[in-house]
UniProtKB/Swiss-Prot annotation:
GO terms for cellular component: cytoplasm; cytosol; early endosome membrane; lysosomal membrane; nucleoplasm; nucleus; protein-containing complex. The modification Phosphoserine is found at residues 9, 215, 536. Binding to PARP9 enhances DTX3L catalytic activity. This is E3 ubiquitin-protein ligase DTX3L. The gene is Dtx3l. Its EC number is 2.3.2.27. It comes from Mus musculus. It catalyses: S-ubiquitinyl-[E2 ubiquitin-conjugating enzyme]-L-cysteine + [acceptor protein]-L-lysine = [E2 ubiquitin-conjugating enzyme]-L-cysteine + N(6)-ubiquitinyl-[acceptor protein]-L-lysine. A zinc finger (RING-type) spans 569-608. The modification N-acetylalanine is found at residue 2.
Length: 748
């Protein structure tokens, strides 16, 4: 009679470290000649014994040959992994993992078996001694008295929402201490209820694992004895996706840690390998309890959402160091922009709005490089007449304060005898705008000088009062009361010079004490016999070394002095020659002075009234516009005007910096709200483009490249979003500012 086949002979083995698909790799190893084994199957023991596996040999002799070999190890990714054999002391009839009990007595170091086999035998064997049951029952009763209530936090990553919801069916009176949109997270109850829930959920997990193992067994192909023993088989439970390397870098840049989260959530390992010069393969390999299909689907959804509507652009700079500086600045301003550097070239990848704002920021150079302006002509400051400065001091000090705030400088006023020096020092060493400060002060000084007025009080008919007027005490008191009014006396009159509001107070002071009345309706002239001079040492203007003050524009004078009337030009700071009166504002200048000034800028130097539209040197190009239904931030309720500028490549002419040299064209896009004010600004911008004022050819401070198309001091919104820092909206004052910029060029 034929003998029955041997029952499967099990062997417990343990790995020193966790590896993916370990049971498949062990199965291959124990069927190879290197192990001495033969036909077998391998299954993990379960959660109670991590990294421990049951090897069932079809032949007991194969198991014996494996046990005779003292050391076992296999290669995983060219790395040796040690396999430890656990020899059992008694036959293992049922290797299914027991459900762990919360009331099981805690094992102490003294009672722990000397090897892992003993503990596994106790955990896996169904034979329990009667005395163990008595101990367990006694412990249950004691524990029940010790713990009045127990709170347990559920593993939401391991248990589905439906499995956690079924808890209320098992224990209806359990308390759900924490429940959110994704289900129950914490439960509270007595010790027995918590233990009951623990057993129930453990059974659910074991059933799911057994179903998965059963489906794997069905997918097995030919008998394993026909498989070449020394060849490691590729695990079938894996997936791979090929994507562009640059898009994957962008995905990891804007979603840091997302790949690690997918690995943790779905129990997979993700490996990235280059497959071609511009492509990479994202591989998904499942762990014992992982789900490759759901992991790959989750990655595809996230990747497509992240990479849609992306735009790529390149920026070339003049030197490698400059490229590094620009890259750091753009990375700070646009955190969701991927910036790749190669030499002097930067590659930008991101949303169209970020790309547009970044390229605009580079082209305008705002915040990217310290602006260095040489103030060689102002190293010692500006010197003005001390006496004149005293007359204008209140207004000039206020102007200096505003200039300090506007240009981030610190003004210093130093009196040096007959001259007063005004010096501006930058507060920020990297941004020197002292030249602009000096220009602003010069304009303010000229405007204030134009406001100076002179009043002449006649002394005819006075007796004793005239002697009192020439008294030193009177002059000292006058200077103390009115330090910003110049006071000069002669035998026939008293001359007062100052700003209108200071002058009115001084005249009241003199009239009250001397009983005088000012002459009216006539301009003051310089007295031919006694020139009006302002002395820094003589309070009466006597025959001492004086600093001459050019005659200011007067409101009244004596008849005797009217013949010598000479007006004052604020441009050359001298007496007007060949007078020219501007038609709109009626300000007067030397003809030669105002002609030169109008060639530079057709506005009045005093009040900035426009006298014509400026002409620019913008190259040939086109300007067009269209409208969109979408609104801009801050202008909800109206559409959007889209302006498109195009300047083609060309050759510079004599009105450009380098005639005969080529320049590259450009395309720019700007946005305005489609409302009444926006359409008005559109008309003004169109007028500026017609007069060639929108663009110019010059040096770009941002890129360091010469002979390029740049904006010409008329600001445009080149992005819909991002605010003023990114040349976008919302910016409630933009339309007002751009109209002022256009007005300064004569367009209004």
């Amino acid at each position: 009679m034929a003998s029955s086949p041997d029952p499967p002979s099990p062997l417990l083995v343990r790995l020193r470290e966790s590896i993916p698909k370990a049971h498949r790799k062990l199965e291959i190893y124990f069927q190879s000649r290197a192990s001495g084994g033969g036909e077998c199957s391998v299954q993990p023991v379960g959660p109670s014994a991590p990294d421990t596996y049951e090897v069932k040999f079809l032949k007991k002799a194969d198991k014996e040959k494996v046990l005779k070999k003292s050391e076992h190890e296999m290669l995983v990714h060219n790395k040796p992994v040690t396999i430890v054999l656990e020899t059992t002391k008694k036959p293992v009839e049922d290797l299914r993992p027991r459900l762990p009990s919360l009331t099981q007595p805690v094992e102490t170091p003294s009672s722990r078996p000397p090897s892992l086999t003993g503990s596994l035998d106790e955990a896996l064997c169904d034979d329990i001694h009667p005395q163990d049951g008595l101990v367990s029952n006694s412990v249950d009763s004691v524990v029940q008295k010790i713990f009045l209530a127990v709170t347990a936090e559920l593993n939401c990553d391991l248990l589905s929402k439906e499995q956690r919801a079924s808890i209320t069916t098992v224990c209806p009176h359990i308390i759900k201490s924490m429940e959110g949109s994704d289900g129950i997270k914490k439960v509270c109850g007595n010790f027995k209820d918590i233990e009951k829930i623990h057993h129930f959920l453990s059974e659910q997990l074991l059933e799911r694992e057994q179903k998965r193992k059963g489906s794997e067994q069905k997918r097995k192909c030919a008998p394993q004895k026909h498989t070449p023993p020394d060849v490691e088989r590729e695990p079938p439970d894996q997936s791979s996706i090929q994507v562009p390397v640059l898009l994957l870098e962008y995905f990891k840049h804007v979603n840091p840690g997302r790949l690690e989260f997918i690995e943790y959530k779905f129990g997979v390992n993700i490996e990235i390998q280059a497959s071609s010069p511009n492509m990479v393969t994202v591989g998904f390999t499942s762990s014992p309890f992982g789900n490759v299909e759901e992991a790959s689907q989750s990655f595809v959804r996230d990747f497509q959402k992240c990479s849609q509507s992306l735009k790529q652009d390149c920026i070339s700079l003049e030197e490698h160091q400059r490229a590094k500086e620009v890259r750091q600045e753009l990375s700070r301003c646009f955190p969701k922009l991927l910036i790749k550097g190669q030499g002097r070239t930067l590659t930008l990848l991101g949303s169209p709005a970020d790309i547009s704002a970044a390229t605009e920021k580079v082209s305008q150079g705002l915040g990217l490089r310290p602006v260095k302006i040489t103030a060689s002509g102002y190293t010692t400051g500006i010197e003005v007449d001390s006496t004149r400065f005293k007359l204008l001091e209140p207004e000039l000090l206020q102007e200096i304060s505003e200039i300090e705030q506007k240009f981030n400088t610190r003004g210093k006023v130093q009196e040096k005898g007959q001259k007063t020096c005004i010096l501006f020092v930058p507060k920020d060493k990297d941004l020197d705008l002292s030249v602009q400060s000096y220009t602003g002060f010069t304009d303010a000084f000229q405007r204030a000088t134009w406001q100076l007025r002179t009043e002449v009080l006649s002394l005819k008919g006075l007796g004793k009062e005239r002697a009192r007027l020439h008294n030193t005490k009177f002059a000292d008191n006058f200077k103390k009361e009115h330090p910003n009014v110049h006071f000069v006396t002669s035998q026939e009159s008293v001359t007062l010079t100052g700003l209108p509001h200071h002058l009115a107070q001084a005249m009241q002071y003199v009239s009250k004490r001397m009983g005088l009345a000012p002459s009216s309706g006539e301009k003051l002239a310089m007295d031919q016999e006694t020139p009006m001079e302002i002395s820094s040492s003589d309070p009466h203007g006597d025959q001492q070394e004086n600093a001459a003050l050019p005659a200011p524009r007067g409101t009244s004078s004596s008849p005797a002095a009217s013949k010598g009337t000479e007006d004052y030009c604020v441009i050359c700071m001298d007496t007007i020659s060949n007078k020219h009166v501007l038609p709109k504002c009626k300000h007067e200048f030397c003809t030669s002075c105002i002609s030169k000034a109008m060639l530079i800028k057709p506005v009045c130097p005093v009040c900035l009234t426009s006298y014509g539209i400026q002409k620019g040197n913008q190259p040939e190009g086109t300007m067009s516009y269209s409208t969109q239904k979408g609104s801009l931030p801050g202008y909800e309720g109206c559409g959007t005007i889209v302006i498109n500028y195009e300047i083609k490549d060309g050759i510079q002419t004599k009105e450009h910096p380098n005639p005969g040299k080529a320049y590259h064209g450009t395309r720019r896009t700007a946005y305005l709200p489609d409302n009444t004010e926006g359409r008005k600004v559109l008309d003004l911008l169109h007028e500026a483009f017609k007069h060639r004022l929108t663009f110019t050819i010059g040096y770009s401070r941002a890129t360091g490249v010469s002979d390029v198309i740049t904006w010409n001091d008329i600001h445009h919104k080149t992005s819909k979003f991002g605010g003023p820092a990114n040349f976008g909206y919302p910016d409630p004052d933009y339309l007002k500012r751009v109209k002022e910029e256009l007005k300064a060029k004569g367009i209004e």
